[in-house]
Amino acid sequence: MAFNLKGRSLLTLKEYTPQEIRYLLDIAKQVKAERKAGIVHQRFVGKTIALIFEKRSTRTRCAFETAFGEEGGHPVFLSTDDIQLGAKESIEDTARVLGRMFDAIEFRGFKQETVEILAKYAGVPVYNGLTDEYHPTQVLADLMTIEEEFGSLKGRKLVFVGDGRNNMANTLAIGCAKMGMHYVINSPKELWPSESFIKEIKDMAAENGGTFELTSVPGEGLEGADAIYTDVWASMGEEAKAEERERLLRPYQVNEEMMKKTGRDDTIFLHCLPAVKGQEVTFEVIEGKQSRVWDQAENRKHTIKAVLIATLL
């Protein structure tokens, strides 16, 4: 079923229905197949997108640039050293100006408030390429990767091990709840999300036939998991907390012993990257036969292209 998403922004995934997320994943599957078959389209000829980056990036920047450029569009990279975003010019005014010059805007940075303001004032679609709170384009790629592996999403079990209140844990919670999956956070209680967020996700999951659970016992809740997911212990901008996180999260390292706790040989390992091998995950796991991190990375491009197609055409 097709949906009219033209003009929509992508800020958290909360604003998209399960059916709309399904639609985006179906487009992503189509464009990936086209790419592999050598089929070339020029869907974005004459269109431009501003790519604003407060935080450095490999996958997000490359995915947006290639997804847009392959379709004949013109991406323009703007670091916050290059523009006046929130410095000599307000975010609101920057949004208004860029909205007159570009067909869309991507923002990757610290505050969720910034991307929300851009979306409110730009008058064109705005995409969250990562903030401290949410990372929706990554989770679309994660969902695509899980579906490629197992053929479906509903009823699948994903366990996030590590910092349970970071942007990945938050957005995976939304994505899993929307798609009727069973989501578990295995994390120290000090790093659990807020009570209000937990309630919101539990209600969302129940509405769609999924579940949301949390446990603080290292390695607990992994039984029967289709996928185990982790992320760096100290996110960008949290370098000062690295030593404290090391102390808290060392028991939560994803290693071969933890992977075996699922009781399955076909459980896959996921990571949004970049990874600190030997810290949150061992070399043996991330480089092993159960790892799908490189498929995830590739799928960033296909899912981002799907979002662009759905919201710009």
Curated annotation (Swiss-Prot):
Keyword Nucleotide-binding: no
One matching Pfam family: OTCace
Protein residues bound to carbamoyl phosphate: 57-60, 84, 108, 135-138, 272-273, 300
GO molecular function, one term: amino acid binding
Gene Ontology CC entries for this record: cytoplasm
Reactions that this protein is recorded to catalyse: carbamoyl phosphate + L-ornithine = L-citrulline + phosphate + H(+)
EC number: 2.1.3.3
Alphabetized SUPFAM superfamilies for the sequence: Aspartate/ornithine carbamoyltransferase
Cysteines engaged in disulfide bonds, as pairs: none
Alphabetically ordered keywords of this record: Amino-acid biosynthesis, Arginine biosynthesis, Cytoplasm, Transferase
Entry's localization field: Cytoplasm
Protein name: Ornithine carbamoyltransferase
Organism: Caldanaerobacter subterraneus subsp. tengcongensis (strain DSM 15242 / JCM 11007 / NBRC 100824 / MB4) (Thermoanaerobacter tengcongensis)
